[in-house]
Swiss-Prot record:
<keyword id="KW-0067">ATP-binding</keyword>
<dbReference type="InterPro" id="IPR000194">
    <property type="entry name" value="ATPase_F1/V1/A1_a/bsu_nucl-bd"/>
</dbReference>
<dbReference type="InterPro" id="IPR038376">
    <property type="entry name" value="ATP_synth_asu_C_sf"/>
</dbReference>
<comment type="similarity">
    <text>Belongs to the ATPase alpha/beta chains family.</text>
</comment>
<keyword id="KW-0997">Cell inner membrane</keyword>
<dbReference type="InterPro" id="IPR005294">
    <property type="entry name" value="ATP_synth_F1_asu"/>
</dbReference>
<dbReference type="InterPro" id="IPR004100">
    <property type="entry name" value="ATPase_F1/V1/A1_a/bsu_N"/>
</dbReference>
<keyword id="KW-1003">Cell membrane</keyword>
<dbReference type="GO" id="GO:0046933">
    <property type="term" value="F:proton-transporting ATP synthase activity, rotational mechanism"/>
</dbReference>
<dbReference type="GO" id="GO:0045259">
    <property type="term" value="C:proton-transporting ATP synthase complex"/>
</dbReference>
<keyword id="KW-0813">Transport</keyword>
<dbReference type="InterPro" id="IPR033732">
    <property type="entry name" value="ATP_synth_F1_a_nt-bd_dom"/>
</dbReference>
<keyword id="KW-0547">Nucleotide-binding</keyword>
<dbReference type="InterPro" id="IPR020003">
    <property type="entry name" value="ATPase_a/bsu_AS"/>
</dbReference>
<comment type="subunit">
    <text>F-type ATPases have 2 components, CF(1) - the catalytic core - and CF(0) - the membrane proton channel. CF(1) has five subunits: alpha(3), beta(3), gamma(1), delta(1), epsilon(1). CF(0) has three main subunits: a(1), b(2) and c(9-12). The alpha and beta chains form an alternating ring which encloses part of the gamma chain. CF(1) is attached to CF(0) by a central stalk formed by the gamma and epsilon chains, while a peripheral stalk is formed by the delta and b chains.</text>
</comment>
<keyword id="KW-0375">Hydrogen ion transport</keyword>
<dbReference type="GO" id="GO:0005524">
    <property type="term" value="F:ATP binding"/>
</dbReference>
Amino acid sequence: MSENIKPSEVSEVLLQQLKGIDTHLQFDEVGNVLQVSDGVARIYGLRNAEANELLEFENGIMAIVMNLEEDNVGAVLLGPTDQIKEGMVVKRTKRIASINVGEGMLGRVIDPLGVPLDGRGQIGGELCEMPLERKAPGVIFRQPVNQPLQTGLKSVDAMIPIGRGQRELIIGDRQTGKTSIAIDTILNQKSNYEAGKPVYCIYVAIGQKGSTVASLVNTLRERGAMDYTIVVAATAADPAALQYFAPFAGAAIGEYFRDTGRDALVVYDDLSKQAVAYREVSLILRRPSGREAYPGDIFYLHSRLLERAAKIINQQEVAEQMNDLPPSLKGKVKAGGSLTALPIIETQAGDVSAYIPTNVISITDGQIFLETDLFNQGFRPAINVGISVSRVGGSAQIKSMKKVAGTLKIDQAQYRELEAFSKFSSDMDPVTAMAIDRGRKNNQLLIQPQYSPMPVGEQIAILYCGTHSLLRDVPLHKVQDFQKSFLEMMRADHQKDVLDVLSSGVINDDVTAIIEKVAADTAQPFKVNE
């Protein structure tokens, strides 16, 4: 047997094996858990860790660095605290917290790290890595808001118009219809999607019940809105860190669409819960607290998030130089995109002068204020027109709507005052009586059921009837019936020559003559029956 072994063959085999040995050493910077409690771990040994860097524990759970101290690192856990023990090994990933974004995300429900929650498998297609934290575009890369974002709600589109690239706050007590306004806005983008000009929607659920999120996703799916929508969910059962990072994940996804030249809408529902989650994390990290025990940088938290909403300049060569562009987007940047933000804030007993509400009001470009009393009286959406405002949306409103509804906001505010005075007065002059009657009827016109957004052409047609006193012969309790009959007749006989023309921003004598004739014909039976 030994005679058959040739030394040359042995040396050849040994040489082959030696060639296959990898002599490169892989160094991982690791540390150990000193202490863990309430979703925060203190780690010793990671001297070169960076702020917002992802860390990985030996059991696969991830954390994000938030505190950099002399002898240890404070990291917030993105998984269950009970699975982390003292002494566990932690390694740096050398990656700043980010999310992988792509077209395959549309129609999916994910967590703030991009992990699917809907049981429909991994997210497919090409993905770009987008950092959760990123500087907002500089002034030179922006352009003024000049294009409308139609919500499908008459009250909003007529009196508090929203433009693409705007930040419009939705504020009110619990159970006043804040989420409904945001969901109706998402549903109203279906016509844009079908026309091949989609506004991609991102709904961020922060600290809500899992059942509420599931019901909402079901509503969007039933109405065909999930085709252009992504839901980011950090429910009440998730760690505070995930609830804190959820809005940043939504902003990062929106920026992917914005920077590739498309329009996106992100809804943060709601930032009050994010502020509470951030307060919880900050207090556990022993950061100094300020007013209402919130940390000192709570204003900066919301301002740096909401400043990321913008309308990007139309010049391609300028857009390509945008500050803080992620490497994954190089070569894919297109000019003219937009990211619109609808942050939601919950107030306590209508107190808009509290700390977080005043912060966000001062950051945003306007607010839609919802009132419990109006909601309980059946005026839905329950918008208080007097203190709701849109600071930049007016320049984005289409001309036909501006012409028809230009004075509606002031008229309705004056009607409220006149009605309050009329309670103390027994006799009224005819002008005041007429103004109050018109105000009441306009109020009825502005009532809109949930999940039934209206095309802008129909909105303008029916509001023309209200603002031009075409309802004077219709009894107050019949206004809703008049609206239904009027719009049915307009859709059947005047879709192209009136409604489509109004939608394009044009209003002329021919169009108004048709509206007045149809309104007179529709009002006739209501007048007779009275």
